[in-house]
């Protein structure tokens, strides 16, 4: 079933749900702000990936060719500070946690992006964008930095609703700024930090500049949808719009923002110390169950984490899984069929996943009744529809990828028990100042392909390479 009609999406810029009409018929271009790879991914990070993976899967199922770009911010103040505190090269720190994010996305079967550009690989395009802004009178150099002149762009604030007079960029006081409402495009070089040559001296890119340059490189001067967390609306996305459109680009036509994962009403974040890392969560539930949970709320809603809510999601997923296994054992092979009209109507209405899930569970109830009555044909039809609908949500229990992931998750849980024991021995050796033994344990883990990183939250481990 691949008709292309009726999709409506909530556009943050319009403040309303709009009919989705792509720039090119049959093609959709999407840019998702990806991770700043400073530490282990937690469920707040990955919720965005799951939410917009559902959008991508639905568009593809509707017959669209989707170009999906998700960037990696691999140069940033937080990365530099954390790497310096750990006495490790910044690029090694970024690469380590980029692998951790990739592993998290893979574990939850988030489809790989069409391209995944790193900020450090696109400095040339960033410099070219700054040059265009300076030529057009929207940017200026000062004190070794380059800034965007906010007052030069009359439409500033339209996405977020901020009035120019009330703007605070959160960058602190900078001597080179003409106006403290201006934001940094390029940061002048500092001792010990990475830098690149430019017409304004050596330095590194500002955060907002990176996404504008990478989106243009891969999707062109104008594209369909820009996605990200609602915390990025201001200043990040507001500044992206300003610098891109001031440079003459149309930029994104629709803006979609997902809600936070909260705990006790507070946004999940490392600074608050209330994060739940993906590796930790996958010791508690299976990958498919975690994906089901993260995708179960409407993408624009806050997702309040609790053990009860997580278990409710697990129970709901297991109910679907058990029904499909029951049908398969009694009626034979369950193929992927067609979704129901009510499921399609739900996703066409701004990706209303809770309503779509209600339709899945309604179909499951019908299928169970048919199976109990001995009507295997009707039960198979229900099961086939459920496979199609759960597949759109990325968690079809009968997909062979999930069965292999369940086995991998169990294996990783066993490995974690062994690694944690080694890390406890290493910590004891360090407390006793037995540095030789501590190094021996770390090297033993490294030779087994396990990378250990000492963080403020204690040692963290990742499967690295082949141990060579």
UniProtKB/Swiss-Prot annotation:
Its EC number is 6.1.1.16. GO terms for molecular function: ATP binding; cysteine-tRNA ligase activity; zinc ion binding. GO terms for cellular component: cytosol. Zn(2+) binds at residues 33, 211, 236, 240. Pfam families: DALR_2, tRNA-synt_1e. GO terms for biological process: cysteinyl-tRNA aminoacylation. Its cofactor is Zn(2+). Its main location: cytoplasm. Belongs to the class-I aminoacyl-tRNA synthetase family. Binds 1 zinc ion per subunit. The lineage of its organism: Bacteria, Bacillati, Actinomycetota, Actinomycetes, Mycobacteriales. Coiled coil: none annotated. It comes from the Bacteria. This is Cysteine--tRNA ligase. Monomer.
């Amino acid at each position: 079933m691949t008709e292309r009609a009726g999709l409506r999406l909530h556009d943050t810029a319009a403040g309303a749900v709009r009919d989705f009409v792509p720039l090119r018929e049959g093609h959709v271009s999407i840019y998702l702000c990806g991770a700043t790879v400073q530490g282990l991914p937690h469920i707040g990070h990955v919720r965005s990936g799951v939410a917009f993976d559902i959008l991508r899967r639905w568009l593809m199922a509707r017959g669209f060719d989707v170009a999906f770009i998700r960037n990696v911010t691999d140069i940033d103040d937080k990365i530099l500070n954390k790497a310096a505190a750990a006495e490790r090269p910044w690029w090694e720190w970024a690469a380590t946690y980029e692998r951790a994010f990739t592993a998290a996305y893979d574990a939850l079967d988030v489809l790989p992006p069409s391209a995944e550009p790193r900020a450090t690989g696109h400095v040339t395009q960033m410099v070219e964008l700054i040059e265009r802004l300076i030529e057009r009178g929207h940017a200026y150099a000062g004190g070794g930095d380059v800034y965007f002149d906010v007052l030069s762009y009359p439409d500033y604030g339209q996405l977020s609703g901020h009035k120019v007079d009330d703007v605070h960029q959160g960058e602190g006081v900078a001597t080179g700024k003409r106006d403290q409402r201006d934001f940094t495009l390029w940061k002048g070089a500092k001792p010990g930090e990475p830098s690149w040559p430019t017409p304004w001296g050596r330095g590194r890119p500002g955060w907002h500049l990176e996404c504008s340059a990478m989106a243009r490189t891969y999707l062109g001067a104008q594209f369909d949808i820009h996605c990200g967390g609602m915390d990025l609306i201001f200043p990040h996305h507001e500044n992206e719009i300003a610098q891109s459109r001031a440079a003459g680009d149309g930029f994104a036509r629709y803006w979609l923002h997902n809600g936070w994962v909260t705990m006790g009403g507070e946004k999940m974040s490392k600074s608050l110390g209330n994060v739940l890392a993906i590796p930790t969560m996958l010791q508690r539930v299976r990958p498919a169950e975690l994906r089901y949970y993260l995708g179960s709320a409407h993408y624009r809603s806050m997702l309040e984490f609790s053990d009860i809510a997580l278990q409710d999601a697990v129970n709901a997923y297991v109910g679907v899984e058990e029904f499909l296994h029951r049908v398969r054992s009694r009626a034979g092979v369950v193929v992927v069929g067609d979704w129901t009209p009510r499921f399609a109507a739900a996703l066409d209405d701004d990706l209303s996943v809770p309503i779509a899930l209600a339709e899945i569970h309604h179909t499951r109830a019908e299928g169970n009744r048919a199976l109990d009555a001995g009507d295997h044909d009707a039960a198979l039809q229900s099961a086939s529809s459920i496979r199609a609908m759960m597949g759109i949500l990325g968690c079809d229990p009968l997909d062979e990828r999930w069965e292999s992931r369940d086995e991998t998750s169990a294996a990783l849980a066993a490995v974690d028990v062994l690694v944690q024991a080694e890390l406890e021995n290493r910590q004891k050796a360090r407390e006793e100042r037995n540095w030789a033994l501590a190094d021996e344990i770390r090297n033993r883990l490294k030779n087994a392909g396990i990378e250990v990183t000492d963080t403020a939250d204690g040692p963290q481990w990742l499967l690295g390479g082949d141990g060579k």
